[in-house]
Structure formats: C-alpha cells, structure tokens
Amino acid sequence: MSVSLVLCTWGGAARTARVYRVVKQAMIRTMFVRLRSAGQVRYQSSFSFPSSQSLLQKGQLGKKKRSVRKLGLGISDKKQYNSGVTSAAQEAGGAVRDLKSEKAQTKKKVYDYSTLPRVEQISDTKLKNMSTEVLYSGYRPLFFDVEPKNSQEGKTLYEFAMKLEEFQEAMSPWVSSATGSEMYAEWDNVPGDVIKDLKPFTPPVVNSRKLNGATGENANDFDEQGNFQKKAFFDKVQSILNRNGKGGRKRPGVTVLKHLKKLKEQN
C-alpha cells in the first residue's frame, strides 16, 4: 500500500500502474527463488581448487602474467617470470618422467649381434672325435673321461696316453724353440745321430805359460819366478800394514796400490 502511494505521488496513473507491475514481478521472482532453493539439497563434491594441481598451475601462471602487464617489464624480465612459472610445472611433471624412465629401464634390452662373426654349430661334434684329434696332435689328452675304460690289455686309456711320453725320444734343444712350439727347418737335413752328439761350445781354459810362450823347463822357471814375486809382494804389504804410524806422513793404502801396479807391469 505504501509503495502504491509513493508511486502515485511520483507520476501519473498509467506510469504508476506500469512500475507497480514491474516491482510486483520482481518480488514474485525473488520469493520463487527462495522457495526453490529452500526445497533443494546441495551436495558438495570432494573436488576443490587447492586439491587440483593443474588449476593451481594455471592460477599461478595467470597471476604472473597479470603482474608482468601491470609492471610493464621488458622482454628479459618476462623470460625470468616465465621461467619461474614453468619451473613449478616442471617439478610437477618430474615425478611422471621418473616413472616413465624406471619403466623403460626395467624393459628387456635387445642387442644386435649381427655384426659379430658366426661360429660353426657343434651339434655334430662328438667327444670321441675331439679326444682322438688331441691324442694324435702330440698333446696330452685332456678330454678323456675320468671313468675307467678298460682296454684289451686291462689298462685304462688314460694310463696308455700317459705312457706314450716314455717312448718318445728326448728332443734336442737345437731343433725347436725353448717352448717346443716352433720347429726350425734348417735342421731337417742333419742326421739324428749328429744332432744327439752336439754339445754347447765351452771356451777352453788358457794357461798363462802358453800365452807367454814358455814351454818345458822354461815354463817351470816362469812359475817359480811368479811365485817368488807374489811372495815378495805379500811380504811387502804386510810390513807396510805393520808399521803402526812409523812411516811418517805416507799412507799405507797408496803404497800398497803402487806395489800392486808395479807387480802387474812386471808380469
């Protein structure tokens, strides 16, 4: 009633009726909305803004862009701001990349061996053939089984192979190398008896009398003279060492060396 009186005083009758209808409709709408909201139950979901990482990143990115626009920064400053924003996204995606890398490492690696040389198959190779080849090649057989295999003579095959070395002749050191792996072909034309009798060269002992040309009685005289000189030399050395400081400033060692040099010159 009060609203209608105010409207009547404000304008004409037609205008008052039109405004009254608009106000009435607005009041009816508000009452209807209130009644409708009072009769409904609002269900709140577990999804919220702080729990969503993507929404947080978008919000941070928007804040950074707005702050850059307000401050009017340059290109370099914008790059720094963008790098700070993207670092948060990189940290969030780091966990996902770690999981992917772990899965990639756990996968079985496939190697390509096509470039390597191929080896012949050993499906057709037998142990008997290998043992026979090793036996006749000159080496001690290593592929025989340890289990006893009796032959016609009642001896094992392993003992027979070990006794083959007893019948083998001792190899001359001139024919082969020290390890026996290399044979010298220049000895093929030399008879075996000659090779057996060969001995290493030992230089003969040369007598000092023959070097000086002394023979017969002169040789004996030469020996006596040498012994006399040696005896005289040792007597002289002994007398020098027994002087006990009576020789003045002379050094006994120098005197002995001089006598030794003189003896060598005489011989």
Swiss-Prot record:
Q: Where is the transit peptide?
A: 1-44
Q: What's the superkingdom here?
A: Eukaryota
What keywords sit in the KW lines?
Mitochondrion, Transit peptide
Cite the residue spans of the region called Disordered.
243-267
Compositionally biased spans, kind Basic residues: 246-267
Q: Name one GO biological process term.
A: aerobic respiration
Record carries keyword Cell wall biogenesis/degradation:
no
A single GO cellular-component term on record: mitochondrion
Q: Where in the cell is it found?
A: Mitochondrion
Q: What is its main location?
A: mitochondrion
Function in brief = Required for respiratory growth, stability of the mitochondrial genome and for proper assembly or maintenance of mitochondrial proteins.
Protein name according to UniProt: Protein PET20, mitochondrial
